[in-house]
Amino acid sequence: MHSWQTTRFQIDLSRPRIMGIVNVTPDSFSDGGRHASASAALRHCEQLLREGADVLDIGGESTRPGSPPVPLAEELARVRPVLQGALKLGAPVSIDTCKPEVMAEALEMGVDIINDIWALRRGQAQAVVAAHPRCGVCLMHMHGEPATMQQAPMPGGPGEAVAAVADFLRERSQTLHALGVARERIVIDPGIGFGKTPEQNLALLARQRELLAATGAPLLAGWSRKSTLGLLLADEGQPPPAPGERISASVAAALIAVQRGAALVRVHDVAATAQALKVWAAVQALSGSQS
């Protein structure tokens, strides 16, 4: 599949696309509080687009490990003005939420994509999406729930985790398709860091093509500043570097994901990722003539 059908845009996936993260939260693991006001968040949206983002992913509830749920009214108050402004910027807009009520209001506003860490398993979420004629949807795998997921990650080894994630994403994709959601509207996300050990996360990257083969759907890779990268970077006996100090590792993971077939990468550091992908694309364009 070479495109992603969304509300207002048919996103061309013949080349990797960048989803820029816009956290309208005081407590996100990497940049909580930096863009908590609507004006700051909209300035950040504009900056990400200048840096090369293809999609804006706006969220009003942190999903970091251990994070508590945000009341519905508070989440809506956070994201509503940002969505209103972002929809005027001429780029696809995604709402990162697990609440059906937020999804429904966002879609009424004209939002292009629903990005749900619960893969539409809560309440009337899948009915909200199925009732919409065109919106895109990203289905993510998560073991457990954000408040406790890293206290009891997925059982089994790396290989068992890859198989379980593939089965889950296949089942969710098939369920939505049976409800009338066209395949070209669906993207999958293995959920790096959502109830998984570092070894399981790395296996999902190393064996990413198995997820693509299992579902036939485009894949969104979300490695940006994740704790697994911090553990890999930590010197012996030292704490991992802070999330903002994991940029090079995040770009490396994004490139590996793209090399293994990811259609989109969800990142905080758009400029660095866009530069790296330009180099990758230039080499890819010549690789056929040198084979």
Name these PLM-found stretches.
Residues M1-P16:
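SAM-dependent methyltransferases
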